[in-house]
Amino acid sequence: MLKLSHLTIRHTKDLRDLVRDLSLTIHEGEKVAIIGEEGNGKSSLLQVLMSSKSLPDYLTIEGEITTSFHSYAYIPQTLPEALKGKTLEEYFFGEDELDYATLYRLADQLHFNSERFASDQTIGSLSGGEALKVQLLHELCCPHELLFLDEPSNDLDLETLDWLQQMIQTSPQTILFISHHEDFLTQTADTIIHLRQIKHRKEAETIVEHLGYQDYSNQREQQFKQQSQQAANDQRAYKKTMEKHRRVRQQVETSLRNTKDSTAGRLLAKKMKSLLSQEKRYEREFQSMTSQPYDEEIINLHFPPLTPLSPQKRVLLLDQE
């Protein structure tokens, strides 16, 4: 079990939250996908879940992480420097204790020539897809309870991708992974952690659903439509109410200005006071009405106001002979 309680991850250089108030319990055997746009903190969350004690200087965390898992493996998006100079022989027959029966069985499934395990070829000389395949073979033959994968579907051919999908589906291990590949997500995930940056990418929104990816996407789309429609209805009703209220107020104001009867004036003043109180109540109600849902901006481009150049300023001088 991996339990997160009110976890917040803050990027101190950008002065923004990447993850806000995330509470979640991940049970043995769950397949958890972390999704979101580039720069939203997916890899940072993966790092924090692996080890909250050895983080980059620019990350700070609040909240609590507890786990009953004793060992984990991590396959990053890019090949680690420490592996680039290792030979295949050193990697597969070095210090790590591997289940060699499983290793050779998986190699056969992946059509990876098992004779290459004793090769002096360096891992850094392999293609991106082969390097990932080699890391998968190695880590799946170690006795890890928890597996972290950062963009595992990148660089893989279709046959290996199909194999990886089936492996994740059938593996008894708990697997947390990052992916943008929608079909891969649909075939593998049973829990979604969605990291979003809303309000011009100034506010973090962290969503957790114990659903497959397709069900989650359909639910999000339906909720977005329903909230948009409800917000539009609320705004129309508020506008209609306020227009009626303003007409009544204008009538009372006109009567107040024109009346010469003190008794009538007092009554009109009381009515005006009541109308002003009513107006404040309408405004408070408006604040609690359904708001339009935020659609995340993918690219963070915001320009400050531009100062026009002087008409006399020379920008380009082209001299043609």
Question: Where on the chain are the PLM-derived regions?
Answer:
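Coupling and communication elements adjacent to P-loop NTPase active sites across diverse families
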Residues: M1-H11, L98-T102, F112-Q121, Q219-E321
